[in-house]
């Protein structure tokens, strides 16, 4: 019976791609695995290709490498991947800023990045992904193009097709200390070591080309969605025509922890990256400041500030290529597993950054971008197993209850150390007490029927709801409880979470991190220190962290800087 169910589900996914590929409604059902193309897999699948993140060089990851490792992604259950930008990028080590291995320093919209492969390789990857029921989201650059410094020698003729200075806003650097001038952010240039010339998207020549170009790319390669980089640096007026032209779900990167700024772009885009929630997930699971009481606060702020927009189309995440890895903030296994589970069961479209399944713990870019192949693609890693379990459960719930993806969680109980919430038939209990502690939650009110038996997805056990519809449950060793009616799980078997406690990662004074559960060791930067857990730059764009947590007024003051 299980085999028949699986086949029907697979066929259904294939048919959906033909009929509704790229629609907002269908993207709600997707679970995204974000790939940094250069760091995921090499052509031949080898696992010993050297890669030093600190060198800021190309390490050899390709589209063919991704295709050859789709089974790794498919085994975790992901049904969408987000790949790096595909355009040709500036070559060489630019003024000490490194190479454009990440794909964000584009110079030619009409050519592919040859470091990642050929046109045939890209077509083959997308075809193979679709055959496996996996959609492909393209990271798109529409805000800027890269020039080699210095400005006095800037060669606009090196760019294609925008090969004249007149296609760009006049040079000025964004001043992040100016908080009340949108024009400064939208028209000035970013400082990234290279010159990121800011495209004049208000010009019809520029905007029309970009809309037509990405419409053509989507048609030619059969992309299913777009992630749009640096949305906050662009005028709102550009996006409606661009979104209409491309015709697929587009999620904009709004790198801001201010909910007003974040939600303002929902007026012109289907979805945005939910950095506001990302910050609160981080605080909650690291027991920082107000802890889990921030989750209902988040819900209240969203209801007040963003109620006219559809939050279920936002991207939910805890890591990406611009952020410190979450295990940099905490080495506690249950806190990390809890944060992973939260992302994969919460509202919105979940996105997992490559390497989260292996526990990557690097800090500031480039330490957060090691090569995945140096882990041997370990499928026994506990983080891999929790992702696999939660992805399978989320997909199962969606098949049982299609309205689940448009519903939102209702908070039932929260404190600094725990949170309880329910969405339809899914009840969640999270805590941040760590792997050496247990916590019992007494008589939690639920929406279940009296005396109903519920299954704990995470721990593979059952509990019984009381006659008064309340539930008393214990969270052991800091792990969460994810519950669902036992009667509705008949015939469905979830993967088992490996909860074997792994030794804490130890770091030498060099850039090599040694662990007992990665084979072989991989290179990444690791930091220790004292002080507050977060330091926010004047731009509010970069979170720096140290290992010692500070509670109370320090955190309150930081939140004041961020949001008021």
Swiss-Prot record:
Membrane topology: Lipid-anchor; GPI-anchor
Subcellular location: Cell membrane
Ligand binding (substrate): 56, 105, 227, 232-233, 322, 369
Cited SUPFAM superfamilies: (Trans)glycosidases (SSF51445), Glycosyl hydrolase domain (SSF51011)
InterPro entries to which the protein is assigned, alphabetical: A-amylase-like, A_amylase_C_dom, Glyco_hydro_13_cat_dom, Glyco_hydro_b, Glycoside_hydrolase_SF
One BP annotation, GO: ascospore wall biogenesis
PTM comment text: N-glycosylated.
Cofactor remark from the record: Binds 2 calcium ions per subunit. Calcium is inhibitory at high concentrations.
Residues that make up the propeptide removed upon maturation: 539-564
Gene Ontology molecular functions: alpha-amylase activity; calcium ion binding
Signal peptide: 1-21
Annotated site, Transition state stabilizer, chain positions: 322
Lipid-anchored residues (GPI-anchor amidated serine): 538
Gene Ontology CC annotations of this record: external side of plasma membrane; fungal-type cell wall; plasma membrane
Pfam short name (any one): A_amylase_dom_C
Listed cofactors: Ca(2+)
UniProt: Ca(2+) 2 binding residues: 229, 253
Keyword Cytoplasm belongs to the record: no
Chain positions recorded as Ca(2+) 1 binding sites: 143, 198
Glycosylation sites: 181, 235, 282, 305, 438, 447, 498
Entry-linked PANTHER family: ALPHA-AMYLASE 3, ALPHA-AMYLASE FAMILY MEMBER
Function: Has a role in cell wall biosynthesis where it is involved in maintaining cell wall strength and shape.
Record's protein name: Alpha-amylase 3
Gene this protein is translated from: aah3
